[in-house]
Regions:
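Helix-adjacent hinge/juxtasegments
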Residues: 67-70
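A cross-family detector of function-defining hotspots
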Residues: 19-63, 79-134, 138-141
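Short, recurring structural edge motifs at helix starts
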Residues: 12-17, 73-78
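Short acidic N-proximal helix/loop "leader" segments that mark the beginning
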Residues: 1-10
Length: 142
């Protein structure tokens, strides 16, 4: 089995061995923790997979809808986490479809992170102090 370092991010498709749209049951033999979210605006199930250091969000039927990388995210042999956002735009010739500012509590302190959506690529990039902090991977076509 290949690991995230070998496979990385395939936009609109997968991260490592985890495929968008697939059922989470395929992955539950791996070490993980599970959380349930039932908010007023959404509900989902979140799994954190320790080896890959990723969070996987699922619909109530178990279908993977989002993969979240906060420690490591390989894309075209480059780790996006910690990369300067301006370098990301230049290196991959990308421009966001939309952007927003969201206040996030990190380690008890607030950060106003810039959130950029790249809808055609199924990517949402969270940036603080011009460095990529989190990448959300989704399939806009699902």
């Amino acid at each position: 089995m290949k690991y995230k370092q070998d496979i990385g991010l395939i936009p609109n498709v997968s991260y490592g061995d985890f495929f968008l749209g697939s059922n989470i049951n395929m992955y539950l033999s791996q070490e993980h923790t599970k959380k349930m979210y039932d908010e007023a605006t959404f509900s989902n199930i979140s799994y954190f997979f320790k080896r890959e250091e990723i969070n996987v969000w699922c619909d109530t039927d178990g279908s993977i809808n989002t993969i979240i990388c906060s420690s490591y995210c390989l894309f075209h042999n480059k780790n996006l986490i910690g990369m300067k956002y301006t370098d990301f735009l230049t290196e991959f010739s990308k421009e966001p479809d939309s952007e927003d500012n969201i206040y996030v509590l990190v380690s008890g302190k607030g950060q106003r992170q810039h959130v950029y959506d790249f809808e055609k690529d199924g990517l949402q990039v969270w940036v603080w102090r011009n460095k990529i902090r989190t990448v959300l991977i989704y399939n806009a076509n699902l």
